[in-house]
Design a protein with these regions (language model features):
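A short, exposed helix-loop element centered on a Lys and neighboring polar residues
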Residues: 47-48, 92
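Conserved NAD(P)H cofactor-binding loop of Rossmann-fold oxidoreductase domains
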Residues: 13-20, 164-165
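Conserved Rossmann-fold SDR core element
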Residues: 88-91, 98-113, 151-162
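Substrate-binding pocket helix/loop in short-chain dehydrogenase/reductase
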Residues: 21-24, 28-33, 124
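Catalytic loop of short-chain dehydrogenase/reductase
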Residues: 16-17, 55, 62-86, 91-100
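C-terminal substrate-recognition "lid" of short-chain dehydrogenase/reductases
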Residues: 136-162, 167
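Active-site loop of short-chain dehydrogenase/reductase
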Residues: 6-9, 22, 54-68, 100-103, ...
């Protein structure tokens, strides 16, 4: 903030590397702590500091947390799922605290978007009603819309899902 001056937009999209699937009994303490440190703790503490900055400087700012469908249902990544569910609640708490100051806080939950080590699982595309995995070009315009004054001005405390419809599919059905 000292170097940039006024900050009006914050997007928390960081996440440490993870295995494709991992049961609750297989996650190590180090993996658990690393995931929560980046996804939950860092996001909250940065957003909290920026929220204070925005409030003190009367900045009508915007914050966006990139969460995940994993926040709402178990998908064999307990540390990732817990961190994303925590992000959703942090987003809602910040929206409630900062809304009276005109600061909007929302979340975007993308579906399966390959990249950063994510390759998907066999049969994944078969479980997506739109018949394909997402692309960054599917997600980015929605993030811009949420952050914009034109489309997102009356929106706070909300999670927008952009997933090709995969949330309609019960992941546990695939486990047989």
């Amino acid at each position: 903030i000292r170097e940039l001056g006024q900050v009006s937009i914050f997007v928390h999209a960081a996440s440490p590397p993870r295995r494709e699937t991992q049961t609750a009994l297989a996650v190590t303490e180090a993996e658990w702590r690393a995931m929560l440190e980046v996804n939950l703790n860092a996001g909250f503490l940065i957003a909290q500091a920026l929220g204070r900055h925005m409030r003190e400087n009367k900045v009508r700012g915007r914050m966006l947390f990139i969460t995940s469908l994993h926040a709402d249902s178990p998908r064999n990544l307990p540390h990732y799922s817990a961190s994303k569910a925590g992000q959703t609640m942090v987003m809602k708490e910040l929206a409630r605290a900062l809304g009276p100051d005109g600061i909007r806080v929302n979340a975007l939950a993308p579906g399966a978007v390959p990249g950063a080590g994510f390759k998907g699982s066999p049969g994944l595309v078969d479980r997506i009603p739109l018949g394909r995995v997402g692309k960054p070009a599917d997600i980015a315009p929605m993030a811009v819309a949420i952050l914009s004054e034109r489309y997102g001005a009356y929106m706070t405390g909300s999670t927008v899902v952009v997933d090709g419809g995969i949330a309609l599919y019960n992941w546990l059905d695939a486990q047989g």
